[in-house]
């Protein structure tokens, strides 16, 4: 009986720690976005013309912009080339600090749909761009509000 209790407690700690991992995400601010934009523009060598479009939330379908958005999503901490998007972290960013998010929520489902639909795109930059655009095209105001534009 003691062994069973120890095993159950161990399982509870593992599950609690796994769930806690998502609570480690810190919601980013408009200042963070501005810093990330500067860093990513430099990384991908975006032209002044493209930079002006990005500031207006316009993202043309070209290789530079694809990699720019990949960089932005990586800086936010919810995309990596090996695992793709972390849907839960994106949802936390959109919901804002202190708001509990649930997988059954409509927004969560939309994020997951876009991430899954575009997970098989060619290169990592294309995956990030097309999945990001999928979500932004239907939820731009929510995205903008999440960084207090």
Swiss-Prot record:
Q: What is the effect of changing residue 140 to R?
A: In strain: 788A
* GO CC, alphabetical: extracellular region; extracellular space
Q: Where in the cell is it found?
A: Secreted
Q: What is its main location?
A: secreted
What keywords were assigned to this record? Answer: Disulfide bond, Olfaction, Secreted, Sensory transduction, Signal, Transport
InterPro entries xref list: PBP/GOBP, PBP_GOBP_sf
Q: In its UniProt entry, what is this protein called?
A: General odorant-binding protein 99b
Which source organism does the UniProt entry give? Drosophila melanogaster (Fruit fly)
Identify the gene encoding this protein: Obp99b
């Amino acid at each position: 009986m003691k062994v069973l209790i120890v095993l159950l407690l161990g399982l509870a700690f593992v599950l609690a720690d796994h769930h806690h991992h998502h609570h480690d995400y810190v919601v980013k601010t408009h200042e963070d976005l501005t810093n990330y934009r500067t860093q990513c523009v430099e990384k991908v060598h975006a032209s002044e013309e493209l930079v002006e479009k990005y500031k207006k939330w316009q993202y043309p379908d070209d290789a530079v912009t694809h990699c720019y958005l990949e960089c932005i999503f990586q800086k936010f901490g919810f995309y990596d080339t090996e695992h793709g998007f972390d849907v839960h972290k994106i949802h936390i960013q959109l919901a804002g600090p202190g708001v509990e998010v649930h997988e059954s929520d409509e927004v969560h489902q939309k994020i997951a749909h876009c991430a899954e639909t575009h997970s098989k795109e060619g290169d990592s930059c294309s995956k990030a761009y097309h999945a990001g655009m999928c979500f932004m095209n239907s939820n731009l105001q929510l995205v903008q509000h999440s960084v207090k534009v």
